[in-house]
Amino acid sequence: MLFSSLTFVWFFLPALALIYYISPGRKLKNGVLLMASLVFYSWGEPRYVVLVVLSILLNYGFGLALDGCGERKGLKKAVFILSILVNLGLLGYFKYFNFFLELAMSLLGRQGFAPRDIALPIGISFYTFQSISYLADTFRGENPAQRNVFRLALYISLFPQILSGPIVKYHELEPQIGDRQESLSMHAYGIKRFVYGLVKKMVFANMFGQVVDRMFDLPLEQLGTVTVWLAVILYSFQIYYDFSGYSDMAIGLDRMFGFTYKENFNYPYLSASVSEFWRRWHISLSTWFRQYLYIPLGGNRKGLARTCVNLFLVFLATGLWHGASMNFICWGVYYGILIVAERLWIGRILEKNPLKFLNHLYTLGEVAVGWLLFRVDTLHNGKILLKAMLIPSKGLWNPRIFADNRILFLLVLAVVFCGPIQQLMPRLKARLFDEENITAADVAVMAALLLLGTLLMVSSTYQAFIYFRF
């Protein structure tokens, strides 16, 4: 079930809100949310809800085992390592088994490899990382093991974030499961954020996505420089509005039920370096890797060389987390090299550069190349398109075939709303994210935007969120 579907917006969500708010007591409300989360997940993946339940039970048992080790550090560490291996093993089987087996067969020179029919369960990368957060926090003693299996189940499976995040660390969410306060203003703000996200998805992401798909389906050798740049720019905005729209919807949904999440995006296309871009893009994933991989590897505490190695490994893991293909591995390597280069010397050049707008152009150019690697089906296709981006060529297709006046108008709006207007008009930004004062004008705007989103849902074809693949 998609957040941007008529079934969810006009049936599932209103029914859940009604049942939730008439349910007395925190335990019953949590029970309603847990059942709704499992129903929500099973709506699209009925067979894999069993995997979610298995993950919950396994991690519940591992948490109790960690707690039961007491001061026996060796045993506790062994249990923790085993728990991580089990979680990564489940993720690895469903997400990486065919990729690594095919890679091994290729290296051994064996032909005729027939991959297994293994479907990727939606959201497995996200709820696996949340489970690891629980285990790591318990192992470190930052929180005791959760002895109520239903509360742990709610943390792992809470429906707003189970499919595509944000990835919420256990020590941030667990206190809210037991003690949170709902209010009319929180619910109203949640609706506002949800509607913002819905419009991002339906108006910008889906519209751009239709054009991008048409362009990438063409014979790539026929695309000229301007056309390729147009495709990459449109995809850059498609993925931003798609994923930030989902995050807005998830944050809004959780706010309706009394939860508070940290922001997952902070206007990444305003960044003046690639390092800054990754502090603003998919913040929950970046902070997860920082806390649970970069710092345990030594962070920046063991000298410059070790810091650079750790940074590179984090981005290699980031690429692999996104998908089982050489594209994503190379995408991670690409960013790893850029981040290390900025740490070694490019960062100093950017700091001393008096023409700061050039820093932004540098960042946007590097990010555009990154999105090209992210979008193409094969590295060979990426090589063809990268050559077209860098070496001027006319191509066989007129860019105006794809960028009609409607798309160009939306592109201008996309540029404005991805950051500049909030920077130039701070009062408007404050109004958009005001949680306390919901005025009649706000209600009217939200109603109009919800109507627009509904009309687009009725008339549009199915387009899943991009990050559902991961």
Residue map of PLM features:
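Membrane-embedded transmembrane alpha-helical bundles that form the catalytic cores
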Residues: 1-469
